[in-house]
Amino acid sequence: MTVIASLVVGSNGATSLNGRSSGLSTPADRARFLQRHRSAAAFIIGKKSAAIESYAASQVPIFIFTRSTQQLSLTHPLMQQVTVDRNLAEITQLIDLRITGDIVVEAGASLLQALIEVGGINILELSISPIAGDGDFINLEELLSKFEIESESEIDGTRLLECRYQRNSANS
């Protein structure tokens, strides 16, 4: 199956505004995000996303990646804590073997970048918003150097890119 990550980045490279990515989202980004979200066979999220985002309506497994061994308070019966104590690619592959369909990563910048570094993301759906954020900055050029842009469009000032991971990129 395919591991697909969604990421919205502000005009200044921030991935959050007031601690959340939703502040950077535009109608075009939100429509694409919801379409991908609703088609997921499973989710990989981080501990912070689990705490602030609502997955109440989800009917698929939700894997929460954390480095902590302390038991998290799980707010949904399909949430499973995954302690990241070994290679992220290996953990993601083990989850991939259990799931039929696409696994959608809805994580913050640090977890997403770690997954990209180990080749754990096949497709990146990147939205570049005209809104400036205030936290969790990334280097967009460095991020995109690991992917081939397969499609790009612009809707009302939001650039929507679909990118495929390059297994043989110079930086991997």
Task: Give the location of each predicted region.
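Enzymes that bind and transform nitrogen-containing heteroaromatic metabolites
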Residues: 1-172
